[in-house]
Amino acid sequence: MTDPFCVGGRRLPGSSKSGPGKDGSRKEVRLPMLHDPPKMGMPVVRGGQTVPGQAPLCFDPGSPASDKTEGKKKGRPKAENQALRDIPLSLMNDWKDEFKAHSRVKCPNSGCWLEFPSIYGLKYHYQRCQGGAISDRLAFPCPFCEAAFTSKTQLEKHRIWNHMDRPLPASKPGPISRPVTISRPVGVSKPIGVSKPVTIGKPVGVSKPIGISKPVSVGRPMPVTKAIPVTRPVPVTKPVTVSRPMPVTKAMPVTKPITVTKSVPVTKPVPVTKPITVTKLVTVTKPVPVTKPVTVSRPIVVSKPVTVSRPIAISRHTPPCKMVLLTRSENKAPRATGRNSGKKRAADSLDTCPIPPKQARPENGEYGPSSMGQSSAFQLSADTSSGSLSPGSRPSGGMEALKAAGPASPPEEDPERTKHRRKQKTPKKFTGEQPSISGTFGLKGLVKAEDKARVHRSKKQEGPGPEDARKKVPAAPITVSKEAPAPVAHPAPGGPEEQWQRAIHERGEAVCPTCNVVTRKTLVGLKKHMEVCQKLQDALKCQHCRKQFKSKAGLNYHTMAEHSAKPSDAEASEGGEQEERERLRKVLKQMGRLRCPQEGCGAAFSSLMGYQYHQRRCGKPPCEVDSPSFPCTHCGKTYRSKAGHDYHVRSEHTAPPPEEPTDKSPEAEDPLGVERTPSGRVRRTSAQVAVFHLQEIAEDELARDWTKRRMKDDLVPETARLNYTRPGLPTLNPQLLEAWKNEVKEKGHVNCPNDCCEAIYSSVSGLKAHLASCSKGAHLAGKYRCLLCPKEFSSESGVKYHILKTHAENWFRTSADPPPKHRSQDSLVPKKEKKKNLAGGKKRGRKPKERTPEEPVAKLPPRRDDWPPGCRDKGARGSTGRKVGVSKAPEK
């Protein structure tokens, strides 16, 4: 065998393996490199012996086996057959200069006109370029120069790089002596005269219509992919096979009968002017509307129930009917047809099936099956031997027929149905229960009723089981009274009752027009439900905007969200201002904010006080709003705010103001000593008090982080809390206290008894502490008294803020400046503070503040003997907590 590592019997360079064979020690001779490998069948000299060329296993260059072995692609020179050309350094430098000048490099070999956009591409090409050796393959010459190329792509690159500004010369048409194969579509701008027939092997795309003046004979079937308009009738001599449905837009006259072997779908109504003879059964899957009376010459067997929406006039007299027991498979009509019946069908069947006028009805107002007229949906067996009866005559054999059809002789049934009868479930009897109005007073039951209605509509083709049908057969024979049957009262034509009755006849149930959810199977049951439903709808309707809701919870939420300031008529009539406040408080708790009810005002408030303040001013002109006024004592001008008044006094009247009247409140301070904002405006007192409280909270949070609580003593010592006294609690009637305690037990809260005070507390002790400082009552409220000066305040925050601003140096005391030895101060200073003073006055955290010796002596606190009697015990009592609010006072 030939060595797989050699080509054409030659040893490849770099291979040292010997080929397999019978003689494993065979030697091989390396041949010189030849440009042309040995041809197939040529003898090869190997090892001094002439070996015939092996055609099947000799890898000829160009064959697939040779390509796989060498790993080279077609069209490239083989590395084994060609030595790579060396490139001198000077030539490389020339290429670099040329590339810098023109951005491309041209092959320097004569006869080669290729250009490359990179030096690496030219280097690879130059090592393998054969120059003019391939001149016989240069079939694409350049029309502007002497260059020639082997492919059209190379010619296009050359033209774009060198002759871009010169237009292409027009090609001259030459005579075609041989057939030309056209592989791509050719655009033809002028008509081409064809003298001989042209054979077309492939389909030719025609974009414009071609006028044909002579008939064209077609030897093969021509597939038509697009619709071709036909203006003249095309005579068809042979049958044409139609594989796809052909839409017919115009009427086509048919002179001969057309045999239809397959079903033809009819999507539009087809007018039939002549009678069509039907020899086979036609299955009708959809209901066919019949607008004209159809004459039926033969009886039509109906296997399924037929819904009849209008009364059918019967021209012939029907013989007396018999009682028929309906099995489950036969009773496919709606349930109302099998169990209930209206008055209209009972009246229609009076002359055919005589029934007594007075019969007992079920509890829910439904008519029993004995009063039911036989519907045309069932095929009843009739006695053919009985003669026809006139409408006015009473059938003589009616009683005997009814007696014969009693429960003693039931009709024959299918034994297979009787075998499986016990497996069927008996449907529950309709009780006619109405939804209750108690509880949440909502329509929550309507959801279940709606689900039941959906299930009933899907199962309304199923009737009651055979047990129900057996129960509804009268146990005793019916006796027909001799009196004429009482005429049935029909509702007025076109009235709602007639529509409901018609709906019961057609669908087996009628929908309540009030709620459009609940359905009833009898007119009496529907009326009974409508009475309750109307009350339910009225109770669940918003009294302000008349919107309807399904539950009481939804109505309450809507009222709170949209009409929070508008109480309902019932609530407005029952309660007064207190009830209205409670209602608004509940709305605020549930909704989070209160909206202004005025039209065009979208203000919302998160507090009851802000809402009531806005209500007193919303929609009123400024003159009607009773705002406070601050008159100037110098010029008489009035201002709406104290800040505006103070600014006017400081800017216009620099002289000191006259003495203030004696009746001025003691808590009012000098306007010149108030704090200002960085912009120069007077800072509001409420804002200053709020900042003070925030500082206290921050100090507490800072002290809570330390492992030892001593830092809090350094920040705010206990002596600072004893520089003012709280007012004493008022003496109250024990009976009044007991009444308040009972009110807290019942309601959970108690209101302030003073007029125009809206304070509310959850404990009697909190209310008592509030009454000590409430200024809206008839009694004189107690004051918070500063122990460092004779000023009094109505709130604890006011006296704290006063001490912070006026007596700031008294908040921090050091051993360098011990407090005066006063009996009141000795009793007020705790033991802990005394130990600190004796220890040498070392304090952690803050540098002691030195007091000037010029401090006035008037800053000393007054003697305990000068305090009011009610404040002695208060001042002597030390406060250990951070802050004791008014609601935390102990109850006496």
From Swiss-Prot:
Residues 418-428, 832-849 have a biased composition (Basic residues). Pfam families: zf-C2H2, ZNF512_C2HC. A zinc finger (C2H2-type) spans 105-129, 140-163, 540-563, 594-618, 630-653, 750-774, 784-807. One of its GO terms (cellular component) is nucleoplasm. Keywords: DNA-binding, Metal-binding, Nucleus, Phosphoprotein, Repeat, Transcription, Transcription regulation, Zinc, Zinc-finger. One of its GO terms (biological process) is negative regulation of miRNA transcription. The keyword Metal-binding applies. InterPro entries: Krueppel_C2H2_Zn-finger, ZNF512_C2HC, Znf_C2H2_sf, Znf_C2H2_type. It is found in: Nucleus. A motif (NuRD interaction motif) lies at residues 421-427. It comes from the Eukaryota. Residues 8-19, 385-398 have a biased composition (Low complexity). Residues 1-82, 323-473, 562-582, 649-682, 812-892 are annotated as: Disordered. The modification Phosphoserine is found at S409, S686. Residues 819-831, 850-876 have a biased composition (Basic and acidic residues). One of its GO terms (molecular function) is RNA polymerase II transcription regulatory region sequence-specific DNA binding. PROSITE patterns: ZINC_FINGER_C2H2_1, ZINC_FINGER_C2H2_2. Its main location: nucleus. Residues 371-384 have a biased composition (Polar residues). Belongs to the krueppel C2H2-type zinc-finger protein family. PANTHER family: ZINC FINGER PROTEIN 512B (PTHR22979:SF3), ZINC FINGER PROTEIN-RELATED (PTHR22979). Involved in transcriptional regulation by repressing gene expression. Associates with the nucleosome remodeling and histone deacetylase (NuRD) complex, which promotes transcriptional repression by histone deacetylation and nucleosome remodeling. Interacts (via its NuRD interaction motif) with RBBP4 of the nucleosome remodeling and deacetylase (NuRD) complex; the interaction is direct and may play a role in repressing gene expression. This is Zinc finger protein 512B. It comes from Homo sapiens (Human).
